[in-house]
């Protein structure tokens, strides 16, 4: 069994520089956070979980069928937020402004994944880039200040060029996301 998800790889130099600064900031270090390595940055479209390796070819076909007419585009990373709520945060994330060019393909893929038994229910797409998983909060003031200061901060643009089937593997060096299949979007 492989732990799989479908997502969009993301690179942002502005977000990387701020994440490095925040992770080195004494105030934020009072809170226990596991920072996501920049090489693992992505927007999750669908989390599939434990999946037999024999199903990968089917997933490749479903992804290809769903996204074959979608063109590459640029979108913007805006604002810092937390899941599930500010009072009990578990995830620190950046918002993604607009994935509208691929929403129809996303919905089609969701329908195909459900029809083929990969997903049980439809979940709304909340496009975001996870910066850190919050283990515990010892200084809620520092986190609140960060959220207030960066709630509408423009982190710049990112190119959306491919949809990727990832395998998530836990190693002694941390979690690694290995691309198993990439569907490149059409050149704009």
Predicted regions and their residues:
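Histidine-dependent nucleotide/RNA phosphoesterase domain, centered on the 2H-phosphoesterase fold
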Residues: 1-188
């Amino acid at each position: 069994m492989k732990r799989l998800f479908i997502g969009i790889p993301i690179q942002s130099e502005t977000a990387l520089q701020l994440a490095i600064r925040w992770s080195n900031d004494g105030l934020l270090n009072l809170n226990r956070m596991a920072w996501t390595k920049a090489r693992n940055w992505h927007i999750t479209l669908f989390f599939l979980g434990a999946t037999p390796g024999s199903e990968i070819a089917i997933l490749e076909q479903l992804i290809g069928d769903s996204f074959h007419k979608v063109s590459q585009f640029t979108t913007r990373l805006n604002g810092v937020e937390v899941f599930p709520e500010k009072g009990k945060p578990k995830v620190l994330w950046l918002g993604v402004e607009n994935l509208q060019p691929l929403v129809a393909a996303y919905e089609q893929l969701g329908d195909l994944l459900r029809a083929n038994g990969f997903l049980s229910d439809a979940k709304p797409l909340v496009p975001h880039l996870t910066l850190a998983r919050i283990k515990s909060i010892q200084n809620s003031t520092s986190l609140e200040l960060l959220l207030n200061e960066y709630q509408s901060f423009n982190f710049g643009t990112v190119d959306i060029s491919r949809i990727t089937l990832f395998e998530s593997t836990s190693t002694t060096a941390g979690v690694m996301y290995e691309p198993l299949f990439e569907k490149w979007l059409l050149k704009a």
